[in-house]
């Protein structure tokens, strides 16, 4: 089985949680609320939301911020959640014994959550130094407009 390599660009840090025991649909409901927000705002939102999926996502966001500050030396106040994705994991299957020797299948879904944090101050500095206004080229707009009067005849459909 091939493993997909993650392209870790400079300025981005991620945390990955695998085999979290909850439905991917329920985790996506929380992830959609925090995508694109700052780190501090995300922590406040996750503490106040009443869903069970908030706790593992809170731990992952906190872990990604710890990775950013320890490994890359980023400031936690300038972190933004650039990507947040939830994928379906394996499904645990059990049999529950029922009456008269029968059994029902019980499925426990799992999911994989990936949180990617981006340092917004790094990208602001990069854009400031790399982009100069003289390098931008403006395209000329096409302003020559010719109007054709169709009421006088002579069009394509008038020929017999």
UniProtKB/Swiss-Prot annotation:
The keyword rRNA-binding applies. One of its GO terms (biological process) is translation. It is found in: Plastid, Chloroplast. Pfam families: Ribosomal_L22. GO terms for cellular component: chloroplast; large ribosomal subunit. Transmembrane segments: none annotated. One of its GO terms (molecular function) is rRNA binding. InterPro entries: Ribosomal_uL22, Ribosomal_uL22_bac/chlpt-type, Ribosomal_uL22_bac/org-type, Ribosomal_uL22_CS, Ribosomal_uL22_sf. Keywords: Chloroplast, Plastid, Ribonucleoprotein, Ribosomal protein, RNA-binding, rRNA-binding. The keyword Repeat does not apply. This protein binds specifically to 23S rRNA. Belongs to the universal ribosomal protein uL22 family. Part of the 50S ribosomal subunit. This is Large ribosomal subunit protein uL22c. The lineage of its organism: Eukaryota, Viridiplantae, Streptophyta, Embryophyta, Tracheophyta.
